[in-house]
C-alpha cells in the first residue's frame, strides 16, 4: 500500500499548535519511556507527556481534524485513532530503524501517521525514512502536511544535524486490517466519487456504490 501524503492543517492552526507545545517546557520527557523493548534501544528524542493538559488538548485537535477529513477517512477507514503524541528532536537526536508494535495499550496499529509541525528548511536531517522492498522512501514535509503509511513498515528518523524537528505521531486502527483490501476499497471509492462528480447519479453508479458498501461490510472487522 502506497503512503498517503496530504495537507491536514492550515498555517494558523500549525502556529497555534507549535506555540502551545513549545511553551510547555516542563512536560517533555525522554521518548524512550513510550517505546517498546526493541524500539527503545534506537529511540533518542523528547516526547510530550501524554496525559499533560497540553498534550490532551492538542491531541484532541489533531484527532478531530483527522476524523473530519474526507480523504483520510476514505484512505484509512478509521475505526479508532489512538496513541497520539508529540515529539521533538534536536541536534544529535533521531530514531533508528524499527517497526511499530502490532498492538498498543489503546488499540491495534494498522496505519501510522506523522504530522509535520516544523518547516523543512528550519532543520537539517530529520527525514522520515520508510523502508520498502528494494529501497527507502525519505519524507520531509511542509508544516501542516501528514503522511499515513502501513504500520507493518520498517521506518526510522534521520539524526537531526541542525535546528529542531517537531511532529505529531499516532496510529489508526482501521475497519479493514489488510493493506491490500484497503487499497482496493480506496480505489473503488475514489473512482465512484469521481464518476458521481462528473456525471451525477445513475443506476449503474448505484450498483458500484452498492458493491463498495457490501465489500466494506464483508471485509471489515
Swiss-Prot record:
Keywords: Dioxygenase, Iron, Metal-binding, Oxidoreductase, Vitamin C. Pfam families: 2OG-FeII_Oxy_3 (PF13640). Its cofactor is Fe(2+); L-ascorbate. Residues 80-174 form the Fe2OG dioxygenase domain. Binds 1 Fe(2+) ion per subunit. GO terms for biological process: DNA damage response; intracellular iron ion homeostasis. Coiled coil: none annotated. Fe cation binds at residues 98, 100, 155. It is an enzyme of class 1 (oxidoreductase). Its EC number is 1.14.11.-. Gene3D superfamilies: q2cbj1_9rhob like domain, Rabenosyn, Rab binding domain. 2-oxoglutarate binds at residue 165. GO terms for molecular function: 2-oxoglutarate-dependent dioxygenase activity; iron ion binding; L-ascorbic acid binding. PANTHER family: PKHD-TYPE HYDROXYLASE YBIX. HAMAP family: Hydroxyl_YbiX (MF_00657). This is PKHD-type hydroxylase P9303_20491. It comes from Prochlorococcus marinus (strain MIT 9303). The lineage of its organism: Bacteria, Bacillati, Cyanobacteriota, Cyanophyceae, Synechococcales.
Amino acid at each position: 500500500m502506497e503512503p498517503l501524503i496530504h495537507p491536514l492543517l492550515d498555517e494558523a492552526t500549525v502556529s497555534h499548535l507549535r506555540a502551545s507545545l513549545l511553551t510547555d517546557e516542563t512536560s517533555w520527557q525522554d521518548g524512550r519511556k513510550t517505546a517498546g523493548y526493541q524500539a527503545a534501544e534506537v529511540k533518542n528524542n523528547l516526547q510530550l507527556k501524554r496525559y499533560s493538559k497540553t498534550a490532551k488538548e492538542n491531541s484532541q485537535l489533531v484527532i478531530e481534524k483527522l476524523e473530519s477529513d474526507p480523504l483520510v477517512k476514505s484512505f484509512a477507514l478509521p475505526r479508532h485513532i489512538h496513541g497520539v503524541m508529540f515529539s521533538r528532536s534536536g541536534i544529535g537526536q533521531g530514531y533508528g530503524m524499527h517497526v511499530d508494535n502490532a498492538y498498543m495499550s489503546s488499540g491495534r496499529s494498522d496505519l501510522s501517521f506523522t504530522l509535520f509541525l516544523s518547516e523543512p528548511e528550519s532543520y537539517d536531517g530529520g527525514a522520515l525514512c520508510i523502508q520498502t522492498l528494494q529501497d527507502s522512501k525519505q519524507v520531509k514535509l511542509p508544516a501542516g502536511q501528514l503522511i499515513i503509511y502501513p504500520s507493518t513498515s520498517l521506518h526510522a528518523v534521520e539524526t537531526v544535524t541542525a535546528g529542531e524537528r517537531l511532529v505529531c505521531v499516532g496510529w489508526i486502527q482501521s475497519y479493514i486490517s489488510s493493506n491490500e483490501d484497503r487499497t482496493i476499497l480506496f480505489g473503488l471509492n475514489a473512482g465512484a466519487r469521481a464518476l458521481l462528480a462528473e456525471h451525477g447519479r445513475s443506476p449503474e453508479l448505484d450498483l458500484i456504490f452498492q458493491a463498495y458498501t457490501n465489500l466494506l461490510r464483508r471485509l471489515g472487522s
